[in-house]
Structure formats: C-alpha cells, structure tokens
C-alpha cells in the first residue's frame, strides 16, 4: 500500500517557509518542487511550468510501471489458478502423469506413457449414474475407471486398468467414449501376439485396447497369486489336457464370473439390473446357464475360489454345445487377441501364459515403485511403508511411519529387486501364515532370523537383511524387535487383496497448491 500511495499521490510543492538549504524530500527521494535531474534549486515562472511538465511526465511513467506490474500480477494469478484447476477439457489420461513421469536412471523401468484415446462422441454418466445402486463394489470400481463404450458394453483400456490398480480413484469423472465395431476392430489390430509380450505391454498399448469386466476380475486374481498358482490356473482352462488352451476354453471364465455376480445382485428394478448386466457383459443373461445352481448359495467365496471350484463343473456341462453361442456373444478384446490371435484360431501354451502373468505382476510393481522413486534406483524406507499400508484397513498409519523415521534415521533405500521379492512373498502369504502359526503356537513372536527362515521354507525366497529389518521397524509397534501374527499377517492380508476391497484414500504431503486451493474455497 505504501508503494501504491507513492505512485498515486502527486509530489508536494515546496513550502515558502522552508529555506533552499533545507529542502523537503518528496516520496520520490528528491527535493519537492524540483524537476527530476535538477540540483534542488527552487523555481518559479517559466521554470515552474517546465517543472510541472516534468512532474506530469514522471507521473505518467509511474502509471506505466504500475500497469505493467498489475498485468504481471494478473498473469501470475491466472497461472496459479490454471495449475490448481487445470483445463476443464483436459483428457482424463493426463490426470496422474505427474505421479508417474519419472523413470530411474540405469534401469529398464518405464512409467505409464500418457496418451489420449481416439476422440469420439462422449457419453455422459448422468443418465446411468443410478445404476451404481444395483452394482457391487467391484462393479462400481470397474464402471468408475472404464472409459470405452461399444454397443452398450463398457470396457477399460490397458491404461485404465493400470490406474485402477495403482491409484485410489480417478481425479476427475471420466466420460465413456463411444466406439463403433469398426473402430474397435481397428484398435485391436495393433495388439501384439503373446510371444511378443513384455513387462511394458499395458504401458505400450496405452489406450489402444479394451479389457472387459470379467477380464478385469481375472487380471486382479493374477496380481495376488503366487507363481505356483499359474499352473493351477492354466490347468483349469485346459479342458482336454493337451497342454494348450484355445479361445472357447478360455471363455468359460465369462460364464463363471457372470454366475457368481448373479447370486450377489441387488434386488430391485429389473430393467436397471438388466442394463447393468449389458454394460458389464455385453449381453443379457441366457435362460439356460452353463453352470448348475450351487447348493452353497450363501457361502461367500473369492473369485479365485469360484473359478477353481466351478471350472470342472462347467467343462463337463453343456459348454461344448453352447461354446459357439458364447463365442458369438462375447466381443473381442485385447486379451483375447493377444492370446488367440486376430482370427481367434491360435492356442495358448503354458510357457506363454506363465510369462504373461509374471509380466503383469512385474509391470504393476514397476509402476508403483516408479511413483515413489523420483527417478532414482531406490525408494526410501518410509515410502516403502506408505506402499505397504496403502490398501490396508489401518486407520492410523502415522504410528507405523513414525516407527520408520525413529528407527531408521539414515536412509539406505529399498531397491526394485528387494521391492519385487517382498511382494512375491506376499503372494505366498497363506503358506507363510502356516509357518508363522507354528512359531506362534505358544503365543510367542519371532525375530528377524526366524522370519527369514520361515519365508524361505514357505516360499523359497531369500529376503535381504535390510529389507527384513525395515519390515520389522515398520510393524514392530511395541519395539521389542519381534513380530507377531497380529502385527503383520492381519495387516498384510488387507494389502494382498488390493483389487477386491475398498481403496483407502491416502493423505498426501501438504503442498502449496493444496493449501492455496483450500484457502480459495474458504473465501
């Protein structure tokens, strides 16, 4: 305000009572009543007119400076607002790019590339928003992240799937981009064959592909299963035992997952539930299901257990008679083209199937690691704790994070190899729990050496001493350097089911942007 006052107020005139030897200094730092550049001598007559002209020019120059400053300030405010709220037309695929835009030096890891899907007619969600009332939590999550609609059926892109398993929720509501059959076929033509797969498949495809709801559930199963379970999954699809799986055999999971959802449907408006089934499966439920009614209707099972228990029943039912009907009803997807070729005639062997499942697990872990590594080859022990606690039901994570800060004051870092080995161990958590219960039989906890030994016996994995020490520092709440079932297994079971349970919103570190946004909303 003082600067503005100096700019706007005219310079005071020289008082006649002041002697020339003691001039009165004006706000501009020169004797009042003198023109700029003059020696401080009072003026009168013509000199006074010239001084007035000079002072007017001086004021005009000051007004110009003020205008420039105001324009610069306005530009700065506009930039801050743009950074806060973004372009309202921004593509949803760009929303999480800042979190995943770095890759560690010296590694082959890549973040999710940001690429917009082909622009088509956008379909608003308002018309079908009330369908969430009839959907399960998994169905709602799929609909939340799906961005493609073709003939009434919703699909995720490979990019959508990565976001669904690595972020808590979309930062902005998406619109479903409507594709015709021809556009979908053109998109799928870019799908590589299975023998060209890699741990960057989903990031390379970006938004040039589609994943159905049943495939989404199947991929979530893969993410939480040990490598030993890959053979079980393959054998479940191999109906004739020839060590090969064809497209018709693979499509049995479509019927299995659909039937499981029918049991859990919310009673209500039949028209709305039919519309929801059309969105998720692309067709209405057939009158004669491939699967027979389950006698244990009230027993809640995971999708993996349902797949394992129901496949044998489906394989010896009327599937062979209806296989062609099911194939004609199911739209081609990226996964089907990747496994069985563009014509659907190729067959999938176990080696390619195993490689695909292993690559998917690796890709998701790479993306999670990169979101915290900031271009480095390691993440901090505290960031490792953040990732472990991310999808758990722990209400107060600050206790665990404080344990890490206090117990490991000097950061050493967790490498990607250590990071990956730990999550491979988590996928074997059930076997490890059996071993841990043996130690815990007499209500005793275990130390680090016993923990490493139990992990190796149950999973065959050797965890590094630093990784084991970090895990103990995170979960050893009572600081006795011992680990119990309650301190570890109970929490990690929540983490293991990352895709099947509700996502816990994680508090992010406060930033200038969040503080400023909060202040603007409060006014």
UniProtKB/Swiss-Prot annotation:
* The organelle targeting sequence, given as a residue range: 1-6
Recorded source organism is Rattus norvegicus (Rat)
Q: Enumerate the residue ranges of region (Disordered).
A: 18-48
One GO cellular component term of this record is: uniplex complex
Q: Which UniProt keywords apply?
A: Calcium, Disulfide bond, Membrane, Metal-binding, Mitochondrion, Mitochondrion inner membrane, Repeat, Transit peptide
UniProt-listed Gene3D superfamilies: EF-hand
Report any Pfam family annotated for this entry. Answer: EF-hand_7
* Database matches in InterPro entries: EF-hand-dom_pair, EF_Hand_1_Ca_BS, EF_hand_dom, MICU1/2/3
| Protein name listed in UniProt | Calcium uptake protein 3, mitochondrial
Q: What is known of its domains?
A: EF-hand domains 1 and 3 have high affinity for calcium and act as sensors of mitochondrial matrix calcium levels. EF-hand domain 2 is degenerate.
Which GO molecular function, any one, fits this protein according to its record?
calcium ion binding
Quaternary structure note: Heterodimer; disulfide-linked; heterodimerizes with MICU1. Component of the uniplex complex, composed of MCU, EMRE/SMDT1, MICU1 and MICU3 in a 4:4:1:1 stoichiometry.
Q: Which residues bind Ca(2+) 2?
A: 476, 478, 480, 482, 487
The principal location of this protein is: mitochondrion
Role summary: Tissue-specific calcium sensor of the mitochondrial calcium uniporter (MCU) channel, which specifically regulates MCU channel activity in the central nervous system and skeletal muscle. Senses calcium level via its EF-hand domains: compared to MICU1 and MICU2, MICU3 has a higher affinity for calcium. MICU1 and MICU3 form a disulfide-linked heterodimer that stimulates and inhibits MCU activity, depending on the concentration of calcium. At low calcium levels, MICU1 occludes the pore of the MCU channel, preventing mitochondrial calcium uptake.
Q: Which BP terms in the Gene Ontology apply to this protein? A: calcium import into the mitochondrion; cellular response to calcium ion; mitochondrial calcium ion homeostasis; positive regulation of neurotransmitter secretion
Q: Which residues are recorded as binding Ca(2+) 1?
A: 238, 240, 242, 244, 246, 249
Residues of the EF-hand domain: 225-260, 414-429, 463-498
Q: Could you say which protein family the record assigns here?
A: Belongs to the MICU1 family. MICU3 subfamily.
Q: Where in the cell is it found?
A: Mitochondrion intermembrane space; Mitochondrion inner membrane
